Each structure stands twice: as structure tokens, then as C-alpha cells.
């Protein structure tokens, strides 16, 4: 167990840094946006989308992880700002023990992993929807529920695995800061944060290409075409999410991982590390983008289809033009 100690000069400078404080305010703004946009995102997913229930369950789970992450990270950001504004002259009380921070850190790591695992779960679910001969309501619900449980389990053990044998005898400025004795696991953690989103992105693109080709093979079968349209729209949204989240996760995992390596090799100073790392920590932005991107994608899809139908009903067409218009509407 760590004993209470005064903050080092470096930690004092970090707490006083306007760079560090501005980053916390921006993160809090992301948190507020997440909370405000989650409810309309849920309403759209449940009532206005073409998603099957298996897809809806995993999307709702992603939103749950995003909001839970923002709650716990927001508590730490507010604590940091309180220390900055009211405790700058009391540097023997601003540090926290790693052992006391462990419960918060487990949730932060677990929910971060949960957002990533849920995307992988969506890829598996979309693969099932694409290749299973019959993917009706009952089967899709069983598959979706099973994947949701597995994702939740993986998320719940992520934080525990990260610090399971760490003595947690150090001091940190905030509970979102990783323990110093778990350095060896950083590389594994950041590798997972890069490889899984890249895998998700690759699979989603392949599925989208496959579904588009399959749609045209059944273009004169209205029922089959409509069912495939549902799959394509759902997969397109998942692909859109995967690409957006991959970019931010890549910045986070590669950027922070590289900074930690440079710091460990004494190539950069702790001050330089502290200056840069706050702008590479993109997880609050990822959590914020989940509901925003869902709202954008679902509304855009509905708007495009409505405009196409309105245009279709206003035009008098020949049989050839009618077939061409039908092809465009379903593409």
C-alpha cells in the first residue's frame, strides 16, 4: 500500500499547466454532448432504423459502455479541475494512491475495451446475418444476445487482467493514469486497441462489398431484395462506425504507445510526455461520436430513401426508365 506523499515538481507543474486544464474542459464538453445525444440516438435505433434486434442489442451495449465510461472519466476530470482551481497551494493532498484508484481504473479500462469489443461483436453479428441461410427474428435474437453477453464478460475482466498482479503502491494525480508497475502490459493493451479496430474495419468493408454484389444478383426478386437492403443498410452503418472509431483509436493506441516508449527509453522528458499525451487521449471523443454518428447515419439513410420515393412517385416513366429507377432506389 502506498503512503500519502506530496506531489513532485513535475506533477505540480502538470496540475498548473493550462494545456492540461484545457484538455479536461474539452473532455467534459465531450461528456455533456454524449449524455445529450444518447437518448435521441437510442430512440432512432429502436424506432427509426432497419436494424434487426441482434444489431440493436450490440449498438445499445456500445452506448451503455460509452456513457458509463464518460461518467467515471468525468468524475476524474472534475476532480482534476477542482484541484487546479482550489488546491494549487496544497500539493501534499492532491495525489491519490493507485490502490484507491483501482476501482475507477478498472471501470475506465473495461468500458474502453467494451466499446472496442462491441464493435467486434457487431462484425460477428453482421457476418452471421450475411452468410446464414435463415437469419430470422428468433435466431438473430439468440445470436445477438449471446454475443452481447460475451462482450460484457470480456469488458468486465479487462481492467482486472491489466492490474491483477500490480502491487499498486504508487501515487497518481488522477485515477485515469495507468499504474507505473504495469508498464509491461501497456504494449499488449495498445496493440489490442489497434488490431481489433483494424480487423473490424477490414471485415465490415468486405461484408459491405459482398452484400452489394449479392443484392444485384437478386434485383428482380422484390422480397429478397428488400431483406438484403436491410442487411446492407445495417452493415453500412456498422462500417461507418468502424472506420470512424478506428481513426481515433489508432491515434490513441499508436500515439500514446509511442510516447510511452520514448519516455521509457529516456528520449523525451516527463514534461514533454505530459504536454503531448492529453491530446492523444481520444477515448472521450470516441464515446461522444458513437451517438452522434448513429444519429447522422440513421437520419441520412431515412432521408435518402424518402427523397428517392418522392421523386419516384412524381415522375412518369417508360418501362425501361422505371426499371432503371427501381435499381437506383435499391442501390
Curated annotation (Swiss-Prot):
Annotated transmembrane regions: 26-46, 58-78, 104-124, 142-162, 189-209, 238-258, 275-295
GO biological process: detection of chemical stimulus involved in sensory perception
Compartments reported by the entry: Membrane
GO cellular component, one term: membrane
GO molecular function, one term: olfactory receptor activity
Membrane topology label: Multi-pass membrane protein
Entry-linked Pfam families: 7TM_GPCR_Sra
Keywords, ordered alphabetically: Membrane, Transmembrane, Transmembrane helix
Protein family: Belongs to the nematode receptor-like protein sra family.
PANTHER family documented for this protein: SERPENTINE RECEPTOR CLASS ALPHA-1-RELATED (PTHR31357:SF5), SERPENTINE RECEPTOR CLASS ALPHA-10 (PTHR31357)
Listed name of the protein: Serpentine receptor class alpha-9
Upper taxonomic lineage: Eukaryota, Metazoa, Ecdysozoa, Nematoda, Chromadorea
Amino acid at each position: 500500500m502506498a503512503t500519502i506523499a506530496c506531489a513532485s515538481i513535475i506533477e505540480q507543474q502538470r496540475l498548473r499547466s493550462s494545456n492540461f486544464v484545457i484538455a479536461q474542459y474539452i473532455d467534459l464538453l465531450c461528456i455533456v454532448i454524449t449524455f445529450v445525444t444518447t437518448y435521441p440516438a437510442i430512440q432512432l435505433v429502436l424506432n427509426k432504423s432497419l436494424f434487426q434486434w441482434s444489431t440493436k442489442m450490440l449498438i445499445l451495449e456500445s452506448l451503455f459502455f460509452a456513457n458509463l465510461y464518460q461518467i467515471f472519466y468525468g468524475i476524474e476530470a472534475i476532480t482534476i479541475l477542482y484541484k487546479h482551481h482550489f488546491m494549487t497551494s496544497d500539493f501534499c493532498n492532491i495525489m491519490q494512491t493507485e490502490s484507491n484508484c483501482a476501482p475507477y481504473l478498472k471501470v475506465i479500462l473495461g468500458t474502453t475495451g467494451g466499446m472496442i469489443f462491441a464493435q467486434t461483436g457487431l462484425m460477428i453479428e453482421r457476418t452471421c446475418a450475411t452468410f446464414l441461410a435463415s437469419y430470422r427474428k428468433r435466431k438473430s435474437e439468440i445470436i445477438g444476445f449471446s454475443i452481447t453477453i460475451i462482450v460484457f464478460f470480456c469488458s468486465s475482466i479487462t481492467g482486472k487482467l491489466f492490474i491483477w498482479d500490480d502491487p499498486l503502491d504508487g501515487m497518481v494525480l488522477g485515477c485515469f493514469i495507468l499504474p507505473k508497475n504495469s508498464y509491461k502490459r501497456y504494449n499488449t493493451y495498445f496493440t489490442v486497441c489497434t488490431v481489433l479496430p483494424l480487423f473490424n474495419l477490414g471485415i465490415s468493408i468486405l461484408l459491405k462489398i459482398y452484400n452489394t454484389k449479392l443484392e444485384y444478383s437478386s434485383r428482380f426478386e422484390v422480397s429478397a431484395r428488400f431483406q438484403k437492403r436491410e442487411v446492407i443498410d445495417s452493415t453500412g452503418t456498422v462500417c461507418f462506425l468502424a472506420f470512424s472509431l478506428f481513426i481515433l483509436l489508432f491515434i490513441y493506441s499508436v500515439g500514446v504507445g509511442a510516447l510511452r516508449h520514448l519516455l521509457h527509453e529516456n528520449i523525451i522528458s516527463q514534461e514533454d510526455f505530459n504536454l503531448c499525451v492529453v491530446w492523444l487521449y481520444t477515448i472521450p471523443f470516441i464515446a461522444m461520436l458513437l451517438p452522434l454518428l448513429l444519429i447522422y447515419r440513421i437520419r441520412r439513410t431515412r432521408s435518402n430513401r424518402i427523397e428517392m420515393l418522392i421523386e419516384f412517385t412524381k415522375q412518369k416513366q417508360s418501362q425501361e426508365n422505371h426499371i432503371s429507377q427501381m435499381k437506383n432506389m435499391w442501390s
